[in-house]
C-alpha cells in the first residue's frame, strides 16, 4: 500500500539532498568529493539548524559516524565515507585516557570496538595509538582511534560534530577554549548546570539539549542560554502527547531531533531497517539521527523513485 507519508518524505529527501549545500553555497569545499555543510561561522550554523516552519526540511545526523560498509564507529573513515555519499553531521563520543588525552570512544572499555582490552581511562594515549578499531561485526580494520582534536580539525569546513559529553568539563572546556570554540562543534547537554557552564565559556557554541518533557523545557528556560544555539533531542520518536512541547520548542526556532539508533537501527537486515525508516509517523521530526545515514537516505530516495550516483 502506498504510504500516506510519501509527499512528506519528499520533503525529507529534499532536506537530505539540500542539507549538503554545494561548495558555491557553503564555501569552498576542502574536498570536492564531500557533501559539506555551511559550518564556517556560528551565524551559518545557527541558520542551518534554525526551525522555520512545518515545511522545513529535516536534517540527517550520523550516530557515531556510521556503521555501514565496514566503517568502525567514531572513526575519521566513517565520517569521510558518509560525506562522500550523503550530507550529514555526526554525533561523536569523547573519552579521556589515563594521561588526560581526549579520544573518540563510546564505551568506557576498549573491548567491543578495538583490539584492546579494559577501561579507556586506564590506558595512556601512547598505548591506545597502537590499537586498531573494529567494525560492527567485530572485524579488525586499519583505522586507529582518533583524538577529539583530530576529529575537530578534520571536520572544520566540512560538517558539524556533536559531542556527547562524557569527559569532565574541567578537561573538555579548556580543550575547546584552546581551539577557539570552533563554530562547527556542538555539545550534547543533559542538565541545566551543564548548559550554564558551557554557555559561560562560549556564547557561540551550539547545544543539542535533551528536552523530553515540558518540565525539562521549563528548567532550561530558567538558564541564560541563547535559544538560537539550541537543537532539542526529544527521544527515539515523536509522540502525539508531546505536541505542546514540540510547538513550544519550534516557536523558539528550535528543531526537534529523534534517534533511530534504539529503534529501527537495531533491525538485523537493510530490508528490515528500510521498512522501519519508511513506516508512518504521526509527527515528522526536524532532525533524524541514525547508525545508517546512507541507508536511510537511499531508502527515502527509493520510496520516491529517485536515483543518486
Regions found by a protein language model. Give the residues of each.
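Bacterial N-terminal signal peptides
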Residues: 8-20
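Phosphate-group recognition and catalysis centered on beta-loop-alpha active-site segments
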Residues: 25-309
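Positively charged n-region of N-terminal signal peptides that target proteins for export
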Residues: 1-6
Amino acid at each position: 500500500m502506498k504510504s500516506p507519508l510519501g509527499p512528506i518524505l519528499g520533503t525529507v529527501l529534499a532536506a537530505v539532498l539540500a542539507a549538503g549545500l554545494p561548495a558555491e553555497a557553503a564555501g569552498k569545499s576542502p574536498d570536492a568529493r564531500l557533501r559539506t555543510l555551511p559550518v564556517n561561522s556560528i551565524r551559518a550554523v545557527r541558520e542551518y539548524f534554525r526551525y522555520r516552519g512545518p515545511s522545513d526540511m529535516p536534517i540527517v545526523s550520523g550516530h557515531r559516524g556510521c556503521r555501514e560498509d565496514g566503517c568502525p564507529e567514531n572513526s575519521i573513515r566513517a565520517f569521510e565515507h558518509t560525506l562522500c555519499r550523503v550530507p550529514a553531521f555526526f554525533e561523536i563520543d569523547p573519552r579521556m585516557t589515563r594521561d588526560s588525552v581526549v579520544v573518540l570512544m563510546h564505551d568506557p572499555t576498549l573491548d567491543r570496538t578495538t583490539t584492546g582490552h579494559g577501561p579507556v581511562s586506564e590506558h595512556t594515549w601512547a598505548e591506545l595509538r597502537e590499537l586498531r578499531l573494529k567494525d560492527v561485526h567485530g572485524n579488525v580494520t586499519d583505522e586507529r582511534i582518533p583524538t577529539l582534536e583530530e576529529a575537530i580539525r578534520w571536520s572544520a569546513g566540512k560538517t558539524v560534530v556533536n559531542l556527547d559529553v562524557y569527559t569532565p568539563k574541567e578537561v573538555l572546556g579548556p580543550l575547546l577554549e584552546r581551539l577557539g570554540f570552533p563554530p562547527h562543534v556542538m555539545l550534547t547537554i543533559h542538565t541545566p548546570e551543564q548548559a550554564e557552564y558551557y554557555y559561560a565559556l562560549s556564547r557561540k557554541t551550539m547545544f543539542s539539549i535533551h528536552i523530553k518533557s515540558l518540565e525539562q523545557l521549563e528548567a532550561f528556560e530558567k538558564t541564560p542560554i541563547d535559544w538560537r544555539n539550541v537543537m532539542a533531542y526529544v527521544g527515539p520518536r515523536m509522540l502525539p502527547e508531546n505536541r505542546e512541547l514540540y510547538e513550544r520548542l519550534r516557536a523558539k526556532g528550535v528543531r526537534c531531533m529523534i534517534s533511530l539508533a534504539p529503534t529501527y537501527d537495531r533491525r538485523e537486515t537493510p530490508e528490515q531497517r528500510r521498512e522501519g525508516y519508511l513506516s508512518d509517523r504521526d509527527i515528522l521530526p526536524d532532525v533524524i539521527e541514525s547508525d545508517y545515514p546512507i541507508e536511510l537516505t537511499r531508502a527515502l530516495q527509493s520510496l520516491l523513485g529517485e536515483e543518486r550516483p
